[in-house]
Amino acid sequence: MAEAGKPRPLTAFAPPPPLWKHFTQDNLKRLEDIKKEASKGEDGKPRKKKWTPAELRALQLPPELRFLVPPEIPKSGQYSVFGELQSLSTTLPSLQEQGIEQLYPSTPTETDPDKPSQPSRPFNHAYYLLKISKSLLLNFLEFVGILSIAPEQFQSKVEDLRNLFINAHHLLNLYRPHQARESLIMMMEEQLNRSREEIQQMDKMHAEINGFLEQLKAQGIDIDSASKSREDVTAKRATGDQDANNANSSRLVWDILDGTD
């Protein structure tokens, strides 16, 4: 009881909800067993099934296992993160919608009520960012002067600094779509350059391989020609030897005939 009365220490993030204690290995195994039992077919064998949160909630789960069922994914509205409500809309709300004074001019906005309100964008955001940065330096010097003369009058200057910082951050957030688009263009250009370099390297390798094959082909023709020449010479020599043998045989026959006479 004494510990319950103690104030909770301030932290950057809120503590997890108490339901995390139900995420034990035993409870997870029990939930898997229930899912297998519920997914059995007519043959009594469990079937593979992708369970949705609604189907899991329809099962007869004990109270300690109901916390293991994930909630439905929010499709519209807001959701809570560490006790703070976050909007599902990706549209950046304008400073006027947030009740904050806007220190730079706005572009004309669309008046169509069917379309979601789009944030107003300055004509030259870089110029106004530089202007707000200089105003921040000036207001900070004034803030230091107030603290040195009348510290109790610091609140108004703190509000001015806060408003300047919010306007600067809003301008930066308005520039993020352009930054993302430019970053995507750079990434695509780098990928295109890499593809071109790879194609050039493949063309170079293709030319080298073709040259090597042509060289082998030329060497093969030379070898065939040399082999054919050697075969011709050998054939001629064989023919000459045969003719000489025939001549010797004929001469021997005539010599024998002459001796017989």
Curated annotation (Swiss-Prot):
Protein's UniProt keywords contain RNA-binding: no
Region span, Disordered: 31-54
Domain of life where this protein originates: Eukaryota
Gene expressing this chain: med7
Subunit (UniProt): Component of the Mediator complex.
GO process terms (BP): regulation of transcription by RNA polymerase II
One Gene Ontology cellular component: mediator complex
Ranges of biased composition (kind: Basic and acidic residues): 31-45
Cellular compartments annotated: Nucleus
Family: Belongs to the Mediator complex subunit 7 family.
One Pfam family linked to the record: Med7
Disulfide links within the chain: none
Source organism of this protein record: Aspergillus fumigatus (strain ATCC MYA-4609 / CBS 101355 / FGSC A1100 / Af293) (Neosartorya fumigata)
Nucleus as UniProt keyword: yes
Keywords for this protein: Activator, Nucleus, Transcription, Transcription regulation
Protein name: Mediator of RNA polymerase II transcription subunit 7
One GO MF term: transcription coregulator activity
Known function: Component of the Mediator complex, a coactivator involved in the regulated transcription of nearly all RNA polymerase II-dependent genes. Mediator functions as a bridge to convey information from gene-specific regulatory proteins to the basal RNA polymerase II transcription machinery. Mediator is recruited to promoters by direct interactions with regulatory proteins and serves as a scaffold for the assembly of a functional preinitiation complex with RNA polymerase II and the general transcription factors.
